[in-house]
Amino acid sequence: TAGRKNSNSEILLKEALLVCQEMGAEVRMINLKDYNIIDCNGCTSCTMGMSMGKYTGCSLDDADDKKKIMDVMLNQDAVIFSAPTYDLMPSSLFLKFMHRNLAYESAFLTKIGAIEPRDRVGALIAVGGSTRSWQSMALECMQATTFTNSFKIVDMYMATQVPAPGQVLLYDEKIARAREIGKNVMEALNTKPEERKWLGDPDYGWCPNCHSNSLCLGEPQWKGLQYPIECTVCGAGGDLERTPDGKWKFVIAANGLERDRTTEEGRGVHCDEIAETQGGF
């Protein structure tokens, strides 16, 4: 969690973890407030190393606690991320930590034998003082940061209208929803990796692929691929179609998951793009 001690974020995370523990899991909670996390300095050492098939680590490994936490995180079967919402999106501490994940890109580390193969499950909890209107990019930003470590997000929850520290304790339904997060994570862990699926509300969000609530008008992508409408999180492409009851839904095109960011194959296309556009610079 990136929340304060005994904050709404930490309280909801504890409730979810308690359910996991009750169902037989070994759990550990890490609060980023207890650690020193430095901003990425943009040295590109990790990306240059990966382009040559070498693991260089992060140039800041010895400067802060990021690696210490990642050594634990990448050795887990599941992680539940919980963060407060500031200015529509997750807190800067959460983003600062997660934006350093490229140096620990799990598909690459697995490929070169630096870490053991692991099918990771993930879930998200965002907490804010208002409705979705003032948390509109919270879960979406959180989910986008989980791609690098190949987390299969099976559920996510936005706790709304709890602006005061610990206020979430006044709402039994919010506590119950956090506990449901823990239950769904355990259900996913007890399911074969190839059969794991979204376990939250099936109608949650606009995107049927990642369940984000964020779409945008499509623009030409690398090598000319274009869709009328795109999911801003997973990159699914398609269009809006009117349903028989007069509402709208996002329908993914036949080739709409060619560059699905939730898959290692889809992210691989992006790596190819960066390599080509960077050229010999």
Functional labels for PLM-detected ranges:
Residues 84, 127-133, 168-170:
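Flexible, glycine/proline-enriched loop segments at strand-loop-helix junctions
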